[in-house]
């Protein structure tokens, strides 16, 4: 979870009221944070804020915390309003960036008055959003520049690796390749673009470099100080919705410091947009649903009041609340998310605890205990556990694995995916039906780390089952990958042998054809006459699609057929 430092004086300046340290401990809860530490430095009190929500980047700075508290205390109510003036600035996006880093969105914020604390918060927010929400700059990277040193129009273009500029913190020009080798940020984040044919550059009409996303700003325009009055904000990444949200978070935080937001026209090869877009988002919730799940006898008016203190505009109609909420939020996906805001405004400490009305004794689910035992077993074999996302997409599960969608590969994977009808992002448009692609994705993001990489995951795969009420079934699976020089089928089979021996099962291998694996080095795992998994050496063309240069072998098993009591 994100942690960051804030000044008590700065927070109180933004809120408009002073509080004791003890009062601040409670106030932080309104912003889904805990007060992790308090200390004094040069006569000033500082807090270590520990955010408890990775889906609320708008709360990862003093500006966001202060804004949330102003509303929660009733100093302001309803939807925050931010005026966006139209500028005459245009950014042109190069078509060659489509497979490198395709999306960039931009804004101008003028009339800023930055002291040291405000500058520190701006940099902190930029880093925290890119690190956590942006997955270490892979999904989102943010640059902030002195706009007075920039001459529009601006170009986000693909550049030759031999082009040069002076990176932030350096005095001499370096080529783009040299920046990846010599600059601290280049070494840290260079793997994100190193294998691309071109590198992204943001330049103005005079050819002056603003930045090399997602690596580093230029020394010329990328150094913002307390003397800076007007800034240009750029956010780049792979998902347009995600970079738009990050831009909204940054510009509204700067607006809390008195900045005036101006939009920028962004021209892509096949469309154009105006950014930022701070149009409020909408949602609708049943009031009785809120009352039922909250366990509180709240009137319609009380629910409306609580929501207005959480920055919603509320219209009550026919037992429902029609809501508008800020464009810097993207976490309202279900009525439970609205309920959470109602309870935060009400105060969790104000809810009377109730004793359970049934005398019950709890114990761990036996199959979950079995899964944990399998995890311990794999750790004992020297493997490292990873936990990857259940959400994925068809391309990752089939296309990158050399598989034909609609064809069953003895349930590893089955013929079809459970796909989301209206996904927020194409990247998260389906539930995975096997785990090996998730582990290959993990390996592809860690090619800069040392080898060997010996990984496993015990996780869920979602399969279509028309016989069930939900038409789906969630299956527990074990997947293993070994990424190391000269890895072979035998290396993986040794681990499979040990797993089966410890679980008390005999098994057979039947040679099969499976396009994800090298022909002749892939087998179907059979237990009691039933295929429960697949093992083999990953096909080089699959590794190439994932950007993995190291040989990989692995296996995947359904765990339910291996569950017996007692086990291990």
UniProtKB/Swiss-Prot annotation:
Catalytic activity: tRNA(Phe) + L-phenylalanine + ATP = L-phenylalanyl-tRNA(Phe) + AMP + diphosphate + H(+)
One of the GO BP terms on file: phenylalanyl-tRNA aminoacylation
Key words of the record: Aminoacyl-tRNA synthetase, ATP-binding, Cytoplasm, Ligase, Magnesium, Metal-binding, Nucleotide-binding, Protein biosynthesis
Domain spans labelled B5: 278-353
Alphabetized GO MF terms: ATP binding; magnesium ion binding; phenylalanine-tRNA ligase activity; RNA binding
InterPro entries listed in its UniProt record: aa-tRNA-synth_II/BPL/LPL (IPR045864), B3/B4_tRNA-bd (IPR005146), DNA-bd_dom_put_sf (IPR009061), Phe-tRNA-ligase_IIc_bsu (IPR045060), Phe-tRNA-synth_IIc_bsu_arc_euk (IPR004531), Phe-tRNA_synthase-like_B3/B4 (IPR020825), Phe_tRNA_ligase_beta2_arc (IPR022918), PheRS_beta_core (IPR041616)
Similarity remark: Belongs to the phenylalanyl-tRNA synthetase beta subunit family. Type 2 subfamily.
Name assigned to this protein: Phenylalanine--tRNA ligase beta subunit
């Amino acid at each position: 979870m994100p942690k960051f430092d804030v000044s008590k004086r700065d927070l109180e300046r933004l809120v408009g009221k002073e509080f004791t340290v003890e009062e601040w401990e409670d106030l932080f809860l309104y912003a889904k944070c805990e007060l992790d530490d308090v200390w004094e430095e040069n006569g000033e009190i500082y807090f270590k804020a520990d955010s408890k929500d990775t889906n609320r980047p708008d709360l990862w700075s003093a500006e966001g915390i202060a804004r949330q508290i102003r509303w929660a205390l009733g100093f302001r109510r309803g939807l925050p309003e931010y005026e966006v003036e139209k500028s005459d600035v245009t950014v042109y996006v190069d078509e060659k960036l489509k497979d490198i880093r395709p999306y960039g969105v931009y804004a101008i914020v003028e009339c800023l008055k930055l002291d040291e604390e405000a500058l520190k918060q701006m940099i902190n927010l930029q880093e925290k959003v890119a690190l956590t929400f942006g997955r270490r700059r892979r999904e989102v990277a943010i640059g902030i520049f002195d706009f007075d040193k920039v001459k529009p129009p601006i170009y986000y273009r693909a550049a030759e690796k031999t082009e040069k500029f002076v990176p932030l913190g350096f005095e001499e020009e370096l080529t783009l390749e040299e920046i990846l080798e010599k600059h601290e940020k280049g070494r840290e984040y260079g793997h994100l673009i190193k294998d691309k044919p071109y590198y992204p550059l943001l330049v103005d009409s005079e050819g002056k470099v603003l930045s090399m996303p997602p690596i580093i700003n230029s020394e010329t325009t990328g150094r913002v100080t307390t003397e800076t009055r007007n800034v240009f904000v750029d956010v780049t990444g792979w998902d347009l919705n995600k970079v738009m949200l990050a831009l909204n978070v940054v510009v509204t935080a700067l607006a809390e410091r008195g900045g005036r937001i101006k939009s920028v026209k962004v021209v892509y090869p096949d469309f154009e947009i105006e950014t930022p877009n701070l149009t409020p988002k909408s949602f609708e919730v049943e009031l009785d649903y809120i009352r039922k799940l909250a366990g509180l006898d709240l009137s319609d008016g009380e629910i409306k009041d609580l929501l207005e203190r959480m920055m919603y505009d509320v219209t009550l109609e026919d037992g429902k609340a029609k809501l508008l909420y800020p464009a810097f939020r993207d976490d309202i996906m279900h009525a439970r998310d609205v309920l959470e805001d109602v309870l935060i405004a009400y105060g969790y400490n104000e809810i009377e605890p109730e004793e359970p009305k049934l005398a019950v004794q709890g114990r761990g689910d036996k199959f979950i205990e079995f899964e944990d035992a399998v995890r311990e077993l794999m750790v004992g074999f020297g493997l490292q556990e990873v936990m990857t996302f259940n959400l994925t997409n068809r391309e990752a599960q089939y296309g990158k694995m050399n598989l034909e969608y609609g064809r069953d590969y003895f349930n590893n994977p089955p013929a079809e995916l459970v796909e989301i009808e209206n996904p927020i992002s194409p990247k998260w448009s389906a539930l995975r039906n096997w785990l090996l692609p998730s582990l290959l994705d993990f390996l592809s993001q860690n090619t800069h780390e040392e080898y060997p990489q010996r990984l496993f995951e015990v996780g869920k795969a979602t399969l279509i089952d028309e016989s069930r009420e939900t038409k789906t079934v969630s299956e527990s699976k074990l997947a293993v990958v070994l990424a190391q020089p000269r890895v072979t089928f035998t290396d993986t089979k040794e681990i499979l042998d040990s797993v089966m021996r410890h679980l008390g099962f005999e098994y057979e291998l039947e040679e099969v054809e499976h396009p994800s694996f090298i022909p002749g080095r892939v087998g179907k795992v059979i237990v009691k006459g039933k295929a429960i998994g697949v093992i083999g050496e990953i096909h080089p063309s699959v590794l190439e699609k994932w950007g993995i240069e190291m040989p990989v072998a692995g296996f995947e098993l359904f765990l339910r057929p291996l569950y017996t009591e007692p086990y291990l």
